Amino acid sequence: MYPRVMHAVCFLALGLISYVAVCAENTVTTNCLVKAENTHLTCKCNPNTTSNTNNGSKCHAMCKCRVTEPITMLGAYSAWGAGSFVATLIVLLVVFFVIYAREEEKNNTGTEVDQCLAYRSLTRKKLEQHAAKKQNIYERIPYRPSRQNDNSPLIEPTGTDDEEDEDDDV
């Protein structure tokens, strides 16, 4: 797998887990009489809060309502709905791709690639290749150190040399 795809999957999984942990748990301020099929109420008594009681001996229960099936049909039948689930996934994807869009391109060694240096290196290679071709052409020409008394032409035309010169021009 590509590293970015793996990072995206992990990012979305962590985001979804944190969303379920935070948003699927709502505080209910009743005395735990409201209970649905797909919820689980955990209640604890807060002795400092004595509201809604006849005498001071009973306390008002602080209940937390946790949804037990948050991912059923993308949350359509759960307490927090499909709309917030899809919106959260969209926000997570946008944040993820904005983070990766700002990342600089890196080569295999892990160092940043400078576009100007890469262009210069490519140009230098092309010039060296061109010079090597020219050098090959000049190596075929015989070198004559003293031409003062020599009236013969530098290159003597032969049938095979002309054919090779035509190939070099292409």
Curated annotation (Swiss-Prot):
Family in the record: Belongs to the HHV-5 RL10 protein family.
Compositionally biased region (Acidic residues): 159-170
Membrane topology: Single-pass membrane protein
Signal peptide positions on this chain: 1-24
Tree of life domain: Viruses
Subcellular location: Virion membrane
Organism: Human cytomegalovirus (strain Merlin) (HHV-5)
Region entry Disordered, spans: 132-170
Name of the protein: Protein IRL10
Coiled-coil intervals: none
Positions glycosylated per UniProt: N48, N55, N107
Main localization of the protein described in the UniProt heading: virion
Entry-linked InterPro entries: Cytomega_TRL10
Gene Ontology CC terms, in alphabetical order: plasma membrane; viral envelope; virion membrane
Keyword vocabulary terms for this entry: Glycoprotein, Membrane, Signal, Transmembrane, Transmembrane helix, Virion
Membrane-traversing stretches: 79-99
